[in-house]
Amino acid sequence: MTGKVYLVGAGPGDPEYLTLQAQQCLQSAEVLIYDALIDPRILDLVPANCDRIAVGKRGGAESTPQATINQLLVEHCQQGRKVIRLKSGDPFVFGRAASELDALERSGCDYAVLPGLSTALAAPLLAGIPITDPVLSRGFAVYTVHEPDALNWEALAQLETLILLMGSRHLLTIGHELIRHGRSPDSPVALIQWAGHPQQTVLESSLSRMAQQWGDQPLSPCVIVIGEVVRLRKYWAHYRYDG
């Protein structure tokens, strides 16, 4: 019997943001290996007899080592089972998919990758922030701030719109480095917490004040948007698709 592993993007939160392909795949899963940020309602889509394995993967919190996750995928696949590796957002956007695919490839396991709606792009929309605009922003860049010392802050400071992930513990560094390299201290900033979940919250501040305003709050998981497009939120912040 031949097994197969599916790396599936769960989107930003609500099960309604799953693709049809992802929903169909989950409904026939035999093993579900999922990250910490997956909405519990998505877990209800798998069969009752599906083995569910939580592997964490949340910044700063306890999680299963990547090598162990790779081993789980290979072992269950070699047992002839349909394995779903469920990741928040899109598997290929800061999803560490390369390590898992490499392990499957080296072990001769069959696999497929199903795209998901990236939280980096969905979060601003759900907060009422267009990340491009004919006047205010002709483009954007998405970066992770997991290792702030590795970033080229001089280059980032010149970009019209910045979308930052894993930055909740580095607000002081983000503000300091961007201002030091020429960004206006008054640049508007929005922080979208738990994007796409029922408890979604949006905070607004400026580059020079955000660390002081938000520093004492538990902010993870969040997406940070920096740029003049944040000012457009006042026109569309009320908009949420409700079916």
Curated annotation (Swiss-Prot):
EC number: 2.1.1.107
Keyword list, A-Z: Cobalamin biosynthesis, Methyltransferase, Porphyrin biosynthesis, S-adenosyl-L-methionine, Transferase
Pathway where this protein functions: Cofactor biosynthesis; adenosylcobalamin biosynthesis; precorrin-2 from uroporphyrinogen III: step 1/1; Porphyrin-containing compound metabolism; siroheme biosynthesis; precorrin-2 from uroporphyrinogen III: step 1/1
Coiled-coil stretches: none
A molecular function GO annotation: uroporphyrin-III C-methyltransferase activity
Annotated TM spans: none
GO BP, sorted A to Z: cobalamin biosynthetic process; methylation; siroheme biosynthetic process
Ubl conjugation as UniProt keyword: no
Catalytic activity: uroporphyrinogen III + 2 S-adenosyl-L-methionine = precorrin-2 + 2 S-adenosyl-L-homocysteine + H(+)
EC category: transferase
Residues the entry annotates as binding S-adenosyl-L-homocysteine: 12, 88-90, 118-119, 166, 195
Protein family membership: Belongs to the precorrin methyltransferase family.
Protein name: Uroporphyrinogen-III C-methyltransferase
Natural source organism: Synechococcus elongatus (strain ATCC 33912 / PCC 7942 / FACHB-805) (Anacystis nidulans R2)
UniProt gene name: cobA
